[in-house]
From Swiss-Prot:
Taxonomic superkingdom: Bacteria
Protein name: UPF0284 protein A9601_04941
One Pfam family, short name: DBI_PRT
Gene3D superfamilies: 3.40.50.10210
Lineage: Bacteria, Bacillati, Cyanobacteriota, Cyanophyceae, Synechococcales
UniProt similarity note: Belongs to the UPF0284 family.
UniProt GO molecular function: nicotinate-nucleotide-dimethylbenzimidazole phosphoribosyltransferase activity
PANTHER family: PTHR38811, UPF0284 PROTEIN SLL1500
């Protein structure tokens, strides 16, 4: 029904049409009552040359998450503090998320972790900002286990306190690489399936980075999810794991808006949960992403790997948003495979479609905001910003 009318694609466990429609109804019913979290996090894995398109170089990638969060909240503004880093192609997905969150009239909550700066805009503090980004995963010592457990407990407490459905999104430069490391730590061979913000995923580079990190981690017998995040993960994973479990304990549906980084969270939780609770846990958990990320089917394969390993029925939904008709190259670049996802673009745009907004309306507003960004000098023109 809705999937055919709106062009929503399902992926993962698609066996039950009634279940698909029920998922759509749950989302549609809860649009106006959602709590959206954008977790912006720092990992020094992002400083590896060529690892991420979230900024044209290592220096710019340090500011990407702050600039994304600012734009998500404020949109194009002459009073912006953070310039959006120049990308080789495309434009920040925060543009999509800003436009669509305004359309559905939801104000996101920003959670900064390991950013090393106190944002001037409204945000939720959960740890000492002086802790800074997690170490590069190649060290095998990304964070202390104490920090991981503290972030998990903070996320758990916040999740359990919620009385409304939750959407979790992220801006974590280098995060797909830490996601791959987490999944491979638990035995999933995913190096050819994990996506990238880059047009051509740096698979060989990531393979080497992950291999080195896992070697240096030197896991002992009976290691758990917290051990893995401490060794090769990032702050986003530790906090989001708690937030997801807490929200489900509060019986709230949860939308994980993204790709492989969200699947890494699912995997960490499934490894942690008692076997008998897995089906109930996964029933009202949604993966929502952009159509650009599911084009080559690798995300579908990744979801099915997790479904098979843990004997669950995780279902994904892909937003029908497209920029084929856009007059701007930066937006049409998405159709060529650049950027693809981030800052909750897939999940938040999906909600806008379910709320009745049309593709041409969203494209028009994205174009308008892009014009304003350029006019206000909000995108850096320097390759080193």
């Amino acid at each position: 029904m809705y999937s055919k009318e709106l062009g929503i694609n399902f992926f993962g466990n698609e066996s039950n049409k009634k279940r698909q429609l029920n998922k759509i109804e749950i989302l549609k019913k809860n649009i106006k009552n959602l709590k959206i979290f954008l977790i912006i996090a720092g990992t020094n894995t992002s400083q590896i040359p060529g690892i991420s398109a979230a900024g044209i170089n290592a220096k710019s990638r340090r500011k990407t998450a702050l600039a994304d969060a600012e734009f998500l909240l404020e949109g194009a503004s002459k009073d912006h503090k953070y310039k959006l880093p120049l990308l080789n192609a495309g434009v920040t997905p925060a543009l999509i998320s800003h436009v669509c969150s305004k359309l559905i009239n939801i104000y996101p909550v920003i959670v900064p972790l390991g950013i090393g700066a106190k944002p001037y805009f409204n945000h939720l503090d959960v740890e000492d900002r002086n802790l800074g980004p997690s170490n590069c995963l190649t060290t095998g010592k990304s964070m202390t286990k104490e920090r991981v457990l503290n972030l998990y407990e903070k996320g758990l407490a916040i999740g359990k306190s919620l009385q409304q459905p939750v959407l979790i999104s992220e801006s974590v430069p280098g995060g797909t690489t830490t996601a791959q490391a987490v999944m491979e730590a638990f035995g999933l061979q995913v190096s050819n399936l994990v996506g990238s913000s880059l047009f051509k995923a740096p698979r060989e580079l990531r393979r080497k980075v992950v291999k080195r990190g896992l070697f240096n981690a030197n896991f002992k017998a009976n290691f758990d999810s917290f051990d893995v995040v401490a060794a090769v993960g990032d702050p986003f994973q530790a906090f989001s794991m708690g937030l997801l479990i807490g929200a489900r304990l509060a019986k709230q549906p949860v939308i994980l808006s993204g790709g492989s980084q969200m699947l890494a969270i699912i995997l960490l939780v499934l490894e942690f949960l008692d076997e008998k609770h897995k089906d109930e846990f996964i029933e009202d958990v949604f993966i929502a992403t952009t159509g650009w990320l599911v084009k080559d089917n690798s995300l579908n394969d990744l979801v099915n790997l997790i479904n098979e390993k843990y004997d669950v029925k995780l279902l994904g939904l892909a937003s029908p948003l497209n920029f084929k008709s856009s007059k701007y190259k930066e937006l049409r670049d998405y159709e060529l495979g650049h950027v693809k996802e981030g800052v909750g673009a897939g999940g938040i745009s999906l909600l806008a479609f379910l709320d009745g907004f049309k593709n041409e309306e969203i494209v028009s507003l994205c174009q308008l905001n892009l014009e304003m960004m350029k006019d206000l000098g909000q995108i850096s023109l320097e390759k080193d910003c």
